[in-house]
């Protein structure tokens, strides 16, 4: 498969200035953010979201697009890797109430503070060792997640996605196309440990035999 497709084209775009934030972030801020605890989700903007709360305006249109693109229905099994508090999972469940929707996240805080409808569907685990059987899911999604792993674990996470999905998967990772984009990404990055150009990501896909679809997050 391996299609480059922007499945988040309906997701609201941030208008925050990239370089201004980069001038303020310290390595201590990054270290705090990479714990993926309260400071990351509900602390200061320099260490994360500055308050990660549910709003239907973020995911409603995007999950409808994903549903149509992959022809999902009430018999589908869907996995969200890096699901955080389960907001996308929740909106998927509203749209496809019969689907089996699971989430994985490394953050105990995210699960403990997840939206109530999805809390029991979230497993605290690492993407490089997914606690599911082979070929279980009809769709596996990992949006802005795998790049938070060290390179060796990131590669293994792609192999795990191949293992647990029957056919379909979609990943989005930090990337750049040119030198300006690279500098903006370095300024913007808070949690990513594996980030590279689009061309280098595509070489990695070949190395791990990633079979799914993909797109990029650009710091623009």
Predicted regions and their residues:
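Hydrophobic adenine-recognition pocket in adenosine-nucleotide-binding enzymes
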Residues: 145
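A conserved beta-strand element that flanks and buttresses the S-adenosyl-L-methionine
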Residues: 141
């Amino acid at each position: 498969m391996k299609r480059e497709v922007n499945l988040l084209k309906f997701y609201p775009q941030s208008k925050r200035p990239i370089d201004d934030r980069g001038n303020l972030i310290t390595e201590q801020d990054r270290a705090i953010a990479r714990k993926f605890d309260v400071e990351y989700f509900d602390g200061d903007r320099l260490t994360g979201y500055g308050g990660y709360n549910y709003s239907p305006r973020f995911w409603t249109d995007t999950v409808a697009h994903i549903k149509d693109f992959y022809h999902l229905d009430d018999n589908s099994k869907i996995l969200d890797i890096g699901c955080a508090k389960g907001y996308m999972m929740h909106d998927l469940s509203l749209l496809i109430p019969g689907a089996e929707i699971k989430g994985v996240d490394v953050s105990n805080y995210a699960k403990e503070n997840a939206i109530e409808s999805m809390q029991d569907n979230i497993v605290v685990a690492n993407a490089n060792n997914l606690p599911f059987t082979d070929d279980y899911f009809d769709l596996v999604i990992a949006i802005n997640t795998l790049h938070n792993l060290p390179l060796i674990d990131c590669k293994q996470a792609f192999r795990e996605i191949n293992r647990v999905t029957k056919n379909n998967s979609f990943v989005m990772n930090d990337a750049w196309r040119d030198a300006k984009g690279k500098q903006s990404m370095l300024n913007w990055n808070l949690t990513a440990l594996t980030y590279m150009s689009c061309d280098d990501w595509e070489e990695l896909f070949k190395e791990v035999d990633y079979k799914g679809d993909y797109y990029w997050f650009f710091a623009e």
